[in-house]
Amino acid sequence: MCGITGFVSAPAAHDELTRAVRGMCGALEHRGPDDAGEWVDAAHGVAIGFRRLAIIDLSPAGHQPMVSASGRYVATLNGEIYNFEELRRELRAGGLAPEFRGHSDTEVMLAAFEAWGIDAVARFNGMFAIAVWDRRERRLYLVRDRMGVKPLYYGFAGDTFVYGSELKALRRHPGFDARIDRNALRLYLSFLYVPAPFSIYEGIAKAMPGTIVTLDPDARTTRTTVYWSARDAAIAGTRDRFAGTEEEASHELEALLRDAIRIRMVADVPIGVFLSGGVDSSLVTALMQAESATPVKSFSIGFDDIGYNEAPYAAAVARHLGTDHTELTVHERDALDVIPRLGRMYDEPFADSSQIPTHLVSALARRHVTVSLSGDGGDELFGGYTRYFVGQRLFRWIARTPRGMRPALGRALGRIPARMYDRLRPRLGERAHKVARVLQANDIDAMYFELVSHWTAAAWPPHSTAVAPVLDRAQWPALADPVERMMYFDQISYLPDDILAKVDRASMAASLESREPLLDYRLVEFAWRLPLSMKVRAGKGKRVLRRVLYRYVPEELIERPKMGFGIPLGAWLRGPLRDWAEPLLSEAALRKHGLLDPAPIRAKWNEHLAGRYDWNFYLWGILMLQVWLDAAA
């Protein structure tokens, strides 16, 4: 895993272009502390930069930017192409292989481009953001992996086309204009992340997963082509449903999982795994251990608050599997130490509070390994979120309630303080108040968007009108089951723009590579073939995943209410984080940048402090925006 950046401008002096691209690379040093490189074509105004975290082929033969054997292509690769050995064999069998100088996946990638053109990306199985300059055709290609594991931004800074793994690299270009896109800000306030293709800056976009962006420097235009899409996977899968039994499906799934994990264990550096003790991470850990002749290094974190502490469950799974397990207990002080860095770590507003423990467990793992596997993606592919199996029941209940009674019922539920619900069950207050807010939904899709949305029109910045393309249900596949529609939305938006963005920035800030075997595209396509009943049934998700897991780990070590990977944010905002949050939520601070109306925010802050409501998600969204605005300034 590394950092890529660069630009295409008018022809300029070699030294001028080199200085500019080195400055951009400097912003990505955390992504690649082991090496740096640049390639410049002054006559055509091209500058390509790279920061390297050495994982495969640690020798100088793995240095980037790398030039293909014929000299036609110059490329940088952030991420991994896991099937590179298979591609190398295919190239050799077809007489298409050059004399390889090393054994890196980047060199195989370039040979594939020479043999099959840029469309070779459809043969790659991996997580990647790729920049390729075609010297013969004078075209720049930017490629993002199928699921959006690796980030990639691009756009124009004046007359110069710029791109990079993170926005902070683009900001270093001398021509960059850091104007906030109010439409992107509106979407952020709704979802607490900026959905693709938006970025927080005007004129800068996120490359969509599964796409190739082609720049024509002469016309100063870009064209986007799709080489894979979750939409096509969903359509194909639901048309060709798996016809066997659940037991047969579990064996086919297990074979795919084992291969996905096997190819992700290839590295020339130490490798480990994040283990929370839940279904997904326990399954990845179990299959890693099955593939390993020595104890796998596993890592987990815990909390003093029992409602959030999964560490004992992770430790029990680790003992059963015989891993080399390391655990860290997170205290309020640890969170306070991380928070000041979040504005720069996430270089656009981002407010998933699990960003804190994700970074802490990444930093813990980095003391021992350079690569760590995770269980991310299991919830979205196999129906793990509570909202999937509760959503349908909730909407049926809402639909039976006379429309005229719903507002009053919502107000009644909302008036009961969150702390009173929490006496019955941890975190019940947060969920009860969310139910109170969705009682106005007209259909289950609208209810779902209400469930995953936060700030509404009262807090949106003026002159903002955008709707994210992913929200255009007319473009969605025709999925009859509303639960599958929820899962589809999560796969195309929440997964890449929240979960994977969180993991990428949190791990890369610690110079750790994270790999997600459950997001192997073969598993995604297989998951869409499975009937929903093999994923969600009788109030429980991930049924077929559990069936595989219980061949390796006893059921009693796993079965418990789902916690999620979070922190006790609501309580911390009333307690140890209050002194930090208060100045950021003052009326003066909220007016400082001219983007927010303090009134609804101050009202929620006061209600939260009084314990009447649990507004932790809403408030964290504003706090992270404020932290980011201050860091960006």
Residue spans for each PLM region:
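Adenosyl-5′-phosphate
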Residues: 1-4, 42, 96, 119, ...
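Generic hydrophobic alpha-helical membrane-span motif
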Residues: 38, 151-154, 283-286, 381, ...
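Short, basic, helix/turn surface patches
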Residues: 131, 349-361, 401-407, 587, ...
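Active-site adenylate/phosphate-handling loop in enzymes that bind or generate adenylated species
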Residues: 146, 360-420, 477, 494, ...
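Short low-complexity, flexible loop/linker segments enriched in glycine and/or proline
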Residues: 340-344, 366, 387-390, 572-574
